[in-house]
UniProtKB/Swiss-Prot annotation:
It is found in: Plastid, Chloroplast. Belongs to the ABC transporter superfamily. Ycf16 family. Coiled coil: none annotated. This is Probable ATP-dependent transporter ycf16. InterPro entries: AAA+_ATPase, ABC_transporter-like_ATP-bd, ABC_transporter-like_CS, FeS-cluster_ATPase_SufC, P-loop_NTPase. PROSITE patterns: ABC_TRANSPORTER_1, ABC_TRANSPORTER_2. The lineage of its organism: Eukaryota, Rhodophyta, Bangiophyceae, Galdieriales, Galdieriaceae. The keyword Acetylation does not apply.
Length: 257
């Protein structure tokens, strides 16, 4: 069965806004519906920059190339509209939002997407019916909804909150930027199981890009493709076995090829 193309990145060159410093130097990447891609590489290779550029972060300027998502040129869309189109970015360090309950934050995001799609917003009672099954899916209890956004959360709770948002917003493309960072083995297993449950619920139609330094999350969520970035370029693409090679040999052997 041939899968439909979801994301196409063509010859993407990016620099920091208001500077001449290039960070991405000709990225090409194709992600089909239902695929899992992992992007690995040393610090400073451009992995996180790529995720933020896809999401529409204003810190970066696209100088050349295209980002096509569901046949739409993302460069014509704001960061908010990209999210409403179905792109979700989970941050390595989720932000705390003082004074805002998690449930209010989540309902605001959910209703924003409904409005973008010209649908009526849901009231608080209806939203509870929607969010409860999602809580169970990621292993959180109801009290979690009434805590302030990420305030006093453990590392695992912050990451679970991100995965809860991913499920609630029914993301077509989820970009997980070092979601495994700072997690112990139990928390990593919990997060991985939650992600796999979400994929199963979507009938494996959601696509995921996992950005990571380490192989361990890929032991739980097996990617279809692994891409290695170095100095702003994808220099090698392979299957899941490439992660094992990188774990044992590092990146220098690729840089010298």
């Amino acid at each position: 069965m041939k899968h439909k193309s979801l994301l196409q990145i063509k010859n993407l060159h990016v620099k920091l806004a208001n500077t001449e410093e290039y960070i991405l130097n000709g990225i090409n990447l194709n992600v089909n519906q239902g695929e899992i891609h992992a992007i690995m590489g040393p610090n400073g290779s451009g992995k996180s920059t790529l995720s933020k550029v896809i999401a529409g972060h204003s810190l970066y300027k696209v100088v050349k190339g295209e980002i096509i998502f569901q046949d739409q040129n993302l460069l014509n869309y704001t960061i908010e509209d990209r999210a409403n189109l179905g792109i979700f970015l989970a941050f390595q360090y989720p932000l705390e939002i003082a004074g805002v309950n998690n449930i209010d934050f989540l309902r605001l995001a959910y209703n924003s997407k409904l409005k973008f799609n010209q649908r009526n917003p849901v009231d608080p009672l209806k939203f509870l019916e929607i969010v409860y099954p999602k809580l169970k899916l990621v292993g959180l209890d109801e009290s979690f909804l009434y805590r302030k956004v990420n305030e006093g959360f453990s590392g695992g709770e912050k990451k679970k909150n991100e995965i809860l948002q991913m499920s609630l917003l029914d993301a077509k493309l989820a970009i997980l930027d070092e979601t495994d960072s700072g997690l112990d083995i139990d928390a990593l297993q919990d997060i991985s199981n939650a992600i796999k449950s979400i994929l199963k619920m979507s009938q494996f139609k959601q696509s995921i890009i996992i950005i990571t330094h380490y192989q361990r999350i890929l032991n739980y969520i097996q990617p279809d493709y692994i891409h290695v970035m170095y100095k702003g370029k994808i220099i090698k693409t392979g299957d899941a076995s490439l992660a094992n090679q990188l774990e044992s040999q590092g990146y220098e052997w690729l840089a010298s090829e």
